[in-house]
Amino acid sequence: MPEPFNSTMPLPSPPNAQPKDEKVGLQDSNQPPEMSASSEKKHPENENRQSQQNLRPTESENNEPYSVHSSSAKKLMVLAASLAGFFSPLSASIYYPALPAIEKALNVSSTQVNLTVTTYLILQGLAPMVTASFSDSAGRRPGYAICFIVYLAANLGLALQNSYAALMVLRALQSAGSSGAIAIANGVVSDIITPQERGSYIAFASVGSILGPSLSPIIGGLFAEYTDWHWIFWFLLIFSGAFCVPFFLFFPETCRKIVGNGKGVPPFWNRNLPDILRARKEKQRQQRAENEEENANRQRSRLSIPNPLKVFVVFTNLQTVMTLCPAGVAFGSYYAVLTGASGEFTRVYHFSEIKVALIFLPMGVGGLISALSTGKLVNWNFHRHARKRGIMVARNRRQELLNFPIERARLEIALPVFCLGCVCTVLYGWLMTQDVNVSGPIILLFVMSWSFAAFYQVLNVLLVDTYPGRGAMVTAVVNLLRCEIGAGMAAMISPLTSATGSGWSYTIIALIGVAATSPLLLTMKYGMKWRQESAAKAEEKKSRMQEAQQRQEV
C-alpha cells in the first residue's frame, strides 16, 4: 500500500499523532466536515496532498466503535428490517389477481376497483414521510410499532368487510401502515453500518421491496383460484402477526439519537425483551444515573412531533435530485415491465392465470441474486478506490467521506448494470413481437430484474452515504418518487403498447431510463467537488452565525 503522506511536505503533528510509518485511514467522522473544509484552505498547494491531510484519522470520543453489535447481530437486524419492509409490496401486488372476483362480489365497476389500487399507491408514497420523521426522532421501534398496529388492524377489517367504501378506506390504511416500514429499514442500516460496509447491508435491506412485487402475484393467484378473496387478507393478517411476535420481542432500538452506538440504555418504550431484562439487573444507582445522563440529550428529542414536510429539504440539493430521479425511473421501468408481462404472455403464448403468475418467479430470483451479489460489488469497489489512494479502511468506525470519491465508487457499479437492463428491455420488447421460444423472454426478465434491482440498491447506498444519520428520511423521498413514477409508468405501458406495439413501447421505456440517468455522469465526475464546496459554504455560514451571536452577547 503506498505511503499516504508526501515526505517533502512537513505536516504539523498533534500530541496524539500516529507514528509516520502507520497507514492512514479515512478521517473519523467525529471531526466535523467544517474542519476538513478549513484545512483545505490552509494547504491549497496540491489537491492530492490536501486530500491526504484531510484523511488523517482522529481519535474518536473514548475510541468507541460505530456500533457495539456483532457482525452476525447486525446481519440479523438488517434481515429483520428487510422482512418488515416486505409487507408493503406484498400487500400491493397480492391483491391484483383477485380484482375480478372483488368487482363481482361487491357489484362495482372495474374503474371503481382500480381506484383502490390508485389509493394504495398514493398512500404508499406519502406515509413514509411521516414515519421517517417520527422514527428519526422517537426511535425505530416506536415507528415500527405504529406501522404494524395500523397494518394489522387494516388487515382484520379487510378480511371481515363486504362493502366498497370499507374496502377503499381500509386499503388506504393498509398501505399507510405497511409502507412506513420500508423507510425505517434503511434508517436501521444507517444507524449501525459504516459507509465502507454499507453496500451489502443496504442490498439486504432492499430485498423485501424487490421480492414483493415478483412473488406476491403468485400467492395472490393461488388464493384467487382456490379460495375466497377474503382469505388474501386473512393470510396477510396471520403472516404479519406471526412476524411481529419475535420482531418486537428481540429487535433492538438502533436510532443513534436514542442509543448512540447501541451502548446506551433506551427509554422504556424503545426497549426490547433483552433490554428489559438487562434494566432489571442494573441495581446500582450510580450506573443508572450515568446511563440517564449519557442519554439525556438523546431522549429529550424523542417526543418531537413528526414533520412530514421536513423530508422535502432533500430536494434543495441539486446533486441529490440528480440521484433521486434515476432511482425512481429505475423502479418505474421495473414496474412497467412487471405490469405489462401478464398481458404480453397471455397474448403471445396464451398462458393461463397460474402460468402467468409463475413467470414472475424468475424476476423474484433475479432480485434475490441481486441482493446477494450487488453489495459485494459495491464494497469491493469502495475498497479498491481506498487502496488506490493509499487509504486504510477502518472496520466498524464511521469515517469522513468529504475527500473520498464516494460517487465514483458507487456509480462505477450502478451505471453499467443499468445499461445492461435497458438493453435487455429493448430486446424483450422486440422478442415479444416474434414467434420465439418462451425461454428467451423469461431469461431477459431475469436479467432485467437483476439489473434494475442492483441499480436501485446502489443509488440507495449512495443517498444514505451523502445523508449520514438520516437514512429513513432519504428513503422516504426515494419511496415517494418510486411509487409515483412507478404508478405513472405502469399506467403508461398498456396504452403505449396498444399504440406503438411491444417493440417500440419497451424501447421508449429504455430510452426514458437512459435520459434520466445521464446526469449521473456529472455526479460521478464532479460529486466530490460539489460536496466539498457545500461543506465550505456551511462552515462559512456557521462562522458568520457565531460571529453575529458573539456581537449580540457583547
Swiss-Prot record:
Q: Which Gene3D superfamilies match?
A: MFS general substrate transporter like domains, Multidrug resistance protein D
Which cysteine pairs are covalently linked by disulfides here?
A: none
Q: Where is the composition biased (Polar residues)?
A: 1-10, 27-38
Main location as per UniProt: membrane
Biased composition annotated in UniProt, kind: Basic and acidic residues: 39-48
Location of the protein in the cell: Membrane
Q: Which InterPro entries match?
A: MFS, MFS_dom, MFS_trans_sf
Can you supply one Gene Ontology CC term for this chain's record? plasma membrane
The entry's family comment says: Belongs to the major facilitator superfamily.
- This chain belongs to which protein, by name? MFS-type transporter tstD
Q: Which organism is it from?
A: Talaromyces stipitatus (strain ATCC 10500 / CBS 375.48 / QM 6759 / NRRL 1006) (Penicillium stipitatum)
